[in-house]
Swiss-Prot record:
SUPFAM superfamilies: HIT-like. This is Bis(5'-adenosyl)-triphosphatase. Substrate binds at residues 8, 27, 83, 89-92, 98. It catalyses: P(1),P(3)-bis(5'-adenosyl) triphosphate + H2O = AMP + ADP + 2 H(+); adenosine 5'-phosphosulfate + H2O = sulfate + AMP + 2 H(+); adenosine 5'-phosphosulfate + NH4(+) = adenosine 5'-phosphoramidate + sulfate + 2 H(+); adenosine 5'-phosphoramidate + H2O = AMP + NH4(+). Residues 2-109 form the HIT domain. It comes from Bos taurus (Bovine). Pfam families: HIT (PF01230). GO terms for biological process: diadenosine triphosphate catabolic process; intrinsic apoptotic signaling pathway by p53 class mediator; negative regulation of proteasomal ubiquitin-dependent protein catabolic process; purine nucleotide metabolic process. Expressed in the brain, kidney, spleen, testis and lung. PANTHER family: BIS(5'-ADENOSYL)-TRIPHOSPHATASE. The record marks 114 as: Important for induction of apoptosis.
């Protein structure tokens, strides 16, 4: 069964957590090692359109996933980010939370991560040549999936 993520169909091999209302997947073009996404299962474009149950499930999943990726990728902190609407930088019309494990000195200016996320998400900069291989993404998802079994 594939997962819908906006205009994209996501293969189960890159999904490492599925809850009642959410799923988590590895990123095809991570900003930092361990940069992953958590999304509601229902394809909902804006945060305001989610039900209270979906919001609770999404953020409980994000908390669990954050704990795992911080540990697995030897981070010391986390950045959680959501762009909600086109003016906020949302390019995939499906609510999603970016979770990025952080380390001291990973960016010269700490807030530069937001510039990197903005560039990362721009469709005009999104070439398949920049994506990781399906095999690499599946291997990362398999390693993360172990934490949730």
């Amino acid at each position: 069964m594939s997962f819908r993520f906006g205009q994209h169909l996501i293969k189960p091999s890159v999904v490492f957590l599925k809850t009642e209302l959410s799923f988590a997947l590895v990123n095809r073009k991570p900003v930092v090692p361990g940069h992953v996404l958590v999304c509601p299962l229902r394809p909902v474009e804006r945060f305001r359109d989610m039900s209270p149950e979906e919001v609770a499930d999404l953020f409980q999943a994000a908390q669990r996933v954050g704990t795992v990726v911080e540990k697995h990728f030897q981070g010391t902190s986390l950045t959680f980010s959501m762009q909600d609407g086109p003016e906020a930088g949302q390019t995939v019309k499906h609510v999603h939370v970016h979770i990025l494990p952080r380390k001291a000195g990973d960016f010269h200016r700490n807030d530069s991560i937001y510039d990197a996320l903005e560039k990362h998400d721009r469709e005009d900069k999104d070439s398949p040549a920049l994506w990781r291989s399906e095999e690499e993404m599946a291997a990362e998802a398999a390693a993360l999936r172990v934490y949730f079994q």
